[in-house]
Amino acid sequence: MKRRTALLLACAMACTMITGCGKKEEAPQQATEQAAAVEADTDADVIADRTRNLLTGLPATEEEASKRPVGIMIENTQSAMPSYGITRADVIYEFPVEGGITRFLALYSDYSGMDRIGSIRSSREYFAYTAIAYDAIYVHCGGSIETYNNILDLGLVDNCDARIKSGFTYRSSDRKSPHNLSTSSEDIDSIIEKLGYATEHDASYAGALNFNKDNDNEVTLDDGEDAAVVVAYQAHPKPWFVYNEEDGLYYRYQFGEPQVDGIDGSQVA
């Protein structure tokens, strides 16, 4: 954004000087010098903070904060329950898709050590745009026509498409297709290396979220009867969240029961 502002500023200054006609020969040179000065200042300003995780806002090493996240399309139907690796995600977006169901985009800053992540499903345009905002490497299996025409075929996102690239996903035997497509941490690393995608953010990338860096106040649920149970929406799968006073977390339920991770049985919170 700052680079774009610098460019617009330089163009505006050049136009003003040319149409103002003071010293005709000096105007282009002045515009060039001022544009260069603005660009130099911009370069100094766009070095992003690398002391915090860009997905959680929590303290992180420079290496951890510089690593690009992986965004994985996860199915959210009863036929695909339980999901695997869902509680390891730092950020989860839930959007509606066709047929009155929803689907997840799970974003991971650290996806290591998992033998099974899924079930993986196809992309929609708005999921892919969200992955772009996070500078994520996008894992999915196929997608809508709009996703291919407007994003994937134009190379706007680094994506690992199981419909096109084989070898980094597998079908499990515990459920029927198409609800049984999974991947693993090692498989993701392998396909990223094979496709030659960068694994670190550019120095100027500052993240998609803004966090309060100086929050010394403990967050509590004061007189939280009205917020003890939160109903997200009434459509299928009718999820709701229940506040746990002991750990200060909201635990998710859907399909009439706790939403758990198939890896270890932990509940989504």
Regions found by a protein language model. Give the residues of each.
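C-terminal motif of bacterial Sec signal peptides marking the signal peptidase cleavage site
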Residues: T16-G20
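Bacterial signal peptide processing site
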Residues: G22-K24
